[in-house]
C-alpha cells in the first residue's frame, strides 16, 4: 500500500513540476505586418431566450450563421448586469461570437496572458491557445499562459466566445516578465 501511495505522489509531483517548468508558447507574428485600425472585428449569432447555447462546441456549431457586428474597442468588457447586451451585440442571452484581429507587443520577451470570460472561450494569439473554457462560468480568470514574443509587432488574435444566461464579460490581463501584470489596454488591439 505504501508503494502505491509513493508512486501516486511521485506522479503528481512530476506533473506539477512539468507544468511549472514548461517552456513558454512561442507566438508567430503576423506576416506581413498589418497597419490596423483600432479595435477588434466581431461576428455574432444570437439564439434568443429559448434556444440555449450550453457549451463551446454548440457555440462553434452556430457560428456559420454569424453576421458582422459593431467592432469591439478591445477586451475590456466587465461583468454586465442581468439583461444587458453582450459586448456590442443587441441581445443579452445565448450569444456566440467570433472575434478576430491583432494584438501588438512593443518588445520581444516572455509575457503572461490571461483571459477572463463569462461564459466560455477559446482564445488564440500568434497561433497559440492562451485560454479555453468549454462550459458555463461566472466572470472569472481562465488559464494564465506564458508566451514568448520573438519580436515586437502585431500578432494574429482569434477568439470564439459564448454567453448563455445571466451576466457576461470578456477581458484580458497581460504583462511582460518582471513587469506589472494588469488589465490589457485597448490600444494594443487592431483590426
Where are these regions (language model features)?
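Extracellular/secretory pathway-exposed regions associated with glycan biology
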Residues: 22-112, 116-191
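Bacterial N-terminal signal peptides
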Residues: 10-18
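Bacterial N-terminal signal peptides that target proteins for export
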Residues: 1-11
Amino acid at each position: 500500500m505504501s508503494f502505491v501511495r509513493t508512486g501516486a505522489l511521485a506522479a503528481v509531483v512530476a506533473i506539477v513540476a512539468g507544468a511549472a517548468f514548461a517552456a513558454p508558447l512561442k507566438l508567430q507574428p503576423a506576416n506581413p505586418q498589418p497597419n490596423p485600425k483600432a479595435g477588434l472585428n466581431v461576428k455574432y449569432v444570437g439564439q434568443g431566450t429559448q434556444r440555449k447555447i450550453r457549451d463551446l462546441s454548440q457555440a462553434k456549431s452556430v457560428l456559420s450563421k454569424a453576421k458582422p457586428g459593431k467592432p469591439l474597442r478591445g477586451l475590456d468588457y466587465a461583468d454586465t448586469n442581468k439583461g444587458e447586451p453582450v459586448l456590442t451585440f443587441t441581445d443579452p442571452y445565448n450569444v456566440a461570437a467570433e472575434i478576430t484581429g491583432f494584438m501588438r507587443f512593443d518588445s520581444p520577451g516572455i509575457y503572461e496572458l490571461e483571459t477572463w470570460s463569462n461564459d466560455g472561450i477559446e482564445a488564440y494569439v500568434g497561433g497559440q491557445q492562451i485560454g479555453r473554457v468549454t462550459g458555463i462560468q461566472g466572470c472569472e480568470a481562465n488559464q494564465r499562459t506564458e508566451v514568448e514574443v520573438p519580436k515586437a509587432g502585431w500578432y494574429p488574435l482569434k477568439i470564439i466566445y459564448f454567453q448563455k444566461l445571466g451576466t457576461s464579460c470578456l477581458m484580458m490581463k497581460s504583462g511582460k516578465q518582471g513587469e506589472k501584470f494588469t488589465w490589457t489596454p485597448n490600444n494594443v488591439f487592431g483590426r
